[in-house]
Amino acid sequence: MAMAVEFKTYVDQACRAAEEFVNIYYETMDKRRRALTRLYLDKATLIWNGNVVTGLEALANFFDMLPSSEFQVNMLDCQPVHEQATQSQTTVLVVTSGTVKFDGNKQHYFNQNFLLTAQTTANNTVWKIASDCFRFQDWATI
């Protein structure tokens, strides 16, 4: 029973972290994009529709090239990642989907997955992105 209570605590922590993170991430993406790299670890990797971007400088350059955006998140799911898979690093998997318009153009459906790791200091815990995978989910016309 103690294991179930402990796991529920991890799940609750993951959900709180994911909800806070998603609000911050997409607001920053839409309104303060130059600050977005602060949410990433130094050696984080982004895969954007199959294109790999690694490291803060490359991420900053990539985000600067994107047109202005309007994200709407319609779905959020999260779960803690088992500590055996992450060398005891507190990690949360966050999955989102929704719609985005770039430069006010046509709306696209998207799916985005994040691996967040807890960066703990004496005063608080900050969640940083270790891995980020973004994909458009538009239907192909046949």
UniProtKB/Swiss-Prot annotation:
Signal peptide coordinates: none
Q: Name one GO biological process term.
A: protein transport
Where it sits in the cell: the answer is: Nucleus; Cytoplasm
Q: Which PROSITE patterns match?
A: NTF2_DOMAIN (PS50177)
InterPro entries linked = NTF2 (IPR045875), NTF2-like_dom_sf (IPR032710), NTF2_dom (IPR002075), Nuclear_transport_factor_2_euk (IPR018222)
Keywords, in A-Z order: Cytoplasm, mRNA transport, Nucleus, Protein transport, Transport
Q: Which residues belong to any copy of the NTF2 domain?
A: 17-136
What CDD domains would the database entry show? NTF2 (cd00780)
Identify the Pfam families for this entry.
NTF2
One GO cellular component term, please give it. Answer: nuclear pore central transport channel
Main subcellular location:
nucleus
Database matches in Gene3D superfamilies: 3.10.450.50
The function of this protein is: Regulator of protein export for NES-containing proteins. Also plays a role in mRNA nuclear export.
Q: What's the subunit arrangement here? A: Associates with NXF1, NXF2, NXF3 and NXF5.
Supply the name of the protein. NTF2-related export protein 2
Q: Which organism is it from?
A: Bos taurus (Bovine)
Taxonomy, top ranks, is: Eukaryota, Metazoa, Chordata, Craniata, Vertebrata
